[in-house]
């Protein structure tokens, strides 16, 4: 059943649910974005809040933290850049006409996705739109980017791919691959029969993995647009994906995580024990951490599938996880950031797998709202 984890600290400064949590590349700071319209910076050294970022006029949907700057996006249709030392707003990016769902910051560009059916590329320093990607017929959610250095060196394709490729997932049931240099659609990835909620990109093989409300994960060649594989064993929406060491982990509304061989689509292992949708995944040093709509985080030995620890304390869905050193950080719709001691998690031998049993679900995960429904907390 797994032992209970102890909370090192509870940070309850936000006055609304936390929608996202980002760790800086140097590991010194955390950034949280909240329903209360603010973001906060936290020190990983002592867990103290070191800056309050105020300025958005509606809730913060997503955030990304770099070493020198923090980036947030909001339902107020804007993106903001902040100084991590002073908390001062350095730039406001305006142009979207509806909720901004996601942002992705690279060395000199910022990409965004929105309910206005577009994705956009911005110059980071000037805050100007450099390209607008139009073609989706509904809300654009997920984003991934393949830099020019990760793409084939082909003189015939240099003009098209010279600025890299952007991959977007939408509630129109498709993903699209865009040429960043021109803004043109390079490929449309058709095959899903439900909204594309999440995607991850394996840049070395030019493969995108997409998760959908149709309960499948699909693998695509982003250069040719070919569908390579379909991963079919989930019984509910696929909400989150994690790719590491040629293994793909998928978290679902069917209350399980599945581990797949990324190159073949073979299901290697199923991680049960959740009492609600699996809302977040994080792999770290041989341990798979999960967050769930049952308000708990869990630590599984990634190789054996054994549940090692359950982290209890939140009262609402866990939206995001990060791990730094020997500390697990969990951000929840209850408004709290919790810090947990993860020392002592040991690898154990793999267990034989039983045949998967199918179950029906009374309702599927529908983006943020379904996973945020309060559920009775029962002993794990």
Q: For the regions a protein language model found, what residue spans apply to each?
A:
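WD40/WD-repeat beta-propeller blade N-cap
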Residues: 11-18, 54-60, 93-100, 134-140, ...
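Residue-level detector of Asp-centered blade-edge/turn motifs that repeat once per structural unit
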Residues: 25-26, 65-67, 105-107, 147-152, ...
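Conserved strand-to-loop turn within each blade of WD40 beta-propeller repeats
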Residues: 33-36, 73-76, 113-116, 169-172, ...
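WD40-repeat beta-propellers
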Residues: 39-42, 63, 79-83, 119-122, ...
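Short loop/turn segments that connect beta-strands within beta-propeller blades
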Residues: 44-46, 84-87, 124-127, 180-183, ...
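Terminal intrinsically disordered, low-complexity extensions flanking WD-repeat/beta-propeller proteins
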Residues: 303-310, 315-380
């Amino acid at each position: 059943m797994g032992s209970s984890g102890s909370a090192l600290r509870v940070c309850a400064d936000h006055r609304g649910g936390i929608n996202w949590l980002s760790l800086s590349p140097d590991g010194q700071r955390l950034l949280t974005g909240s329903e209360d319209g603010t973001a906060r910076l936290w020190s990983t050294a002592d867990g103290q809040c070191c800056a309050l970022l105020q300025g958005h006029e509606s809730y913060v949907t997503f955030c990304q933290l770099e070493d020198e700057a923090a980036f947030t996006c909001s339902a107020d249709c804007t993106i903001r850049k902040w100084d991590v030392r002073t908390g001062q707003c350095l730039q406001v990016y305006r142009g979207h006409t509806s909720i901004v769902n996601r942002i992705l910051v690279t060395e000199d560009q910022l990409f965004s996705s929105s309910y206005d059916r577009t994705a956009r590329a911005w110059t980071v320093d000037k805050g100007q739109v450099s390209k607008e990607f139009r073609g989706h017929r509904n809300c654009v959610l997920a984003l991934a980017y393949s830099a020019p250095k990760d793409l084939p060196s082909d003189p015939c394709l240099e003009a098209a791919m010279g600025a890299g490729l952007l991959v977007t997932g939408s509630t129109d049931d498709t993903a699209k691959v865009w040429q960043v240099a021109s803004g043109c659609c390079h490929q449309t990835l058709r095959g899903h029969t439900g909204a594309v909620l999440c995607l991850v990109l394996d840049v070395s093989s030019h493969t995108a993995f997409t998760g959908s409300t149709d309960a499948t994960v699909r693998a695509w060649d982003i250069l040719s647009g070919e569908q390579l594989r379909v991963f079919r064993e989930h019984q509910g929406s696929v909400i989150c994906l994690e790719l590491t060491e040629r293994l793909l982990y998928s978290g679902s509304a069917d209350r399980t995580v599945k581990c797949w061989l990324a190159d073949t689509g073979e299901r290697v292992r199923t991680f049960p024990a959740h009492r609600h949708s699996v809302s977040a995944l994080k792999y770290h040093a041989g341990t798979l951490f999960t967050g769930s709509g049952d308000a708990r985080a869990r630590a599984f030995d990634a190789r054996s599938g054994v549940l090692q620890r359950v982290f209890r304390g939140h009262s609402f869905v866990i939206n995001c996880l990060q791990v730094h050193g020997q500390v697990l950080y969990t951000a929840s719709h209850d408004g709290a950031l919790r810090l947990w001691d993860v020392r002592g998690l040991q690898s154990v031998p793999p267990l034989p797998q039983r045949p998967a049993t199918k179950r029906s679900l009374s309702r599927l995960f529908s983006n943020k709202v379904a996973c945020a429904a309060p559920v009775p907390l029962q002993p794990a």
